[in-house]
Amino acid sequence: VTGEPPDPDLVAAHVAGDPEAFAELFRRHRDVLWAVALRTTGNPEDAADALQDAMLSALRSAATFRGRSAVRTWLYRIVVNACLDRLRRSAARPAVPLGGHDTPDPADAITRTGQRVDLLRALATLSPGQRAAVVLVDAHGLPVSEVAEILEVPVGTVKSRCARARAHLAKELGGPGGGSRRGGNPSAPSGVPSGYPWDGRR
């Protein structure tokens, strides 16, 4: 939007002592960072804790940002690392994310809540590396090259993690090539059957 400073300027302003700059940067990216944290950890409590850890880390390490990647990539990396650290310390159990958009059809809301829980449970059965890769590529639509930069692994590793994750999700959710628990759609682009609420809000 015209008149809004670009992300790198906000980082620089924060480092220079502007008390409002980092708050604006977080506000700008808050929703997508929360979605990444929720899908990577699998439950709202761990997601909130990981996001708080990540933002404190970003706040303190902003002076080390050199602009070699986009600010978004830098923030994603910090959030994903915080989530993976939390997953390594404790086995997270998915729960239903609260909030979201209202729907006029209660039956549809119940269906989507069930799908959301199924999806989070299926994601929780992936290895942390596979989960982070498939969330960033399939749920957020990031280029494989950017995800490789975020996760600090080769592009080929991201591709193989996504392929294994999709096959596993297809089996868990009844997608293409998987079982029939949820009646997968052969036209679905990944292991998640069409109609499943990747964003946790729809």
Language-model segments: which ranges?
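C-terminal edge and immediately downstream basic/flexible tail or linker adjoining helix-turn-helix-like DNA-binding
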Residues: 2-3, 13, 120-121, 125, ...
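Internal acidic/polar
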Residues: 3-7, 85, 92-116, 143, ...
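Short, charged helix-capping/linker segments at alpha-helix termini
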Residues: 15-24, 34-53
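Residues within the DNA-recognition helix of helix-turn-helix
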Residues: 29, 50, 161-168
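Structural recognition of an alpha-helix C-terminal capping motif at a helix-to-coil junction
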Residues: 35, 49-56, 60, 69-81
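Helix-turn-helix DNA-binding module
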Residues: 45, 124-132, 136, 140-157, ...
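Residue cluster at the C-terminal edge of the helix-turn-helix DNA-binding motif
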Residues: 57, 61, 86, 129, ...
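Arg/Lys-rich amphipathic alpha helix in sigma70-family domain 2
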Residues: 60-67, 77-98, 111-112, 164
